[in-house]
Amino acid sequence: MRPMWLSLDTNLQYRFDDDIAPVAFFEHLPLLLTPTDTLVLGCYDARPDIRRFLAAEAVPPAWGRFNFTETWDINREEHPFGTAFHLRADSGTLRQLIHFAESVTEHIELCDHIAAYSTEHPLLVYHGTFWEPLFVSTRIPRSNVEAFSCAIGVPFEEIDFDKTYFSAIISHDEPNA
């Protein structure tokens, strides 16, 4: 069973383990995404002005498989007002997200989860936004990921997701492990 987030559909992934400043994340996101990619913000308790902006800018999901993945719908009982907003990753949207990131005192006022995808593939997933690991698809050129890493001041590593995460789960399930 995959973790409760959008799968990147590749075993090899880039992982950023350290905290990332929200402003730096949105400022340098164009190094990873194109304006035609879709950025998804999963929000449980977004500030009202932020929620209004996200709702006004939201577009229908552009990647059919997104509807069939376990995303944030599973949390509806605990977070009945939770919503995933699909947005164009264009400069206007990112400028506004930078402005919001500068104005919040806690990241949950902005969003709880972030994902991004092209029309064909998932590109990144950030389940615990700004404090849990950010996973980036190896479909994004390594040179772009290196530039993003340099710009935000957070190192990354290439990992085999299944070996890194599922071998740990299996070993915990085995007796005397």
Regions found by a protein language model. Give the residues of each.
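Structured alpha/beta or helical-core interaction and ligand-binding surfaces enriched in interleaved
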Residues: 1-177
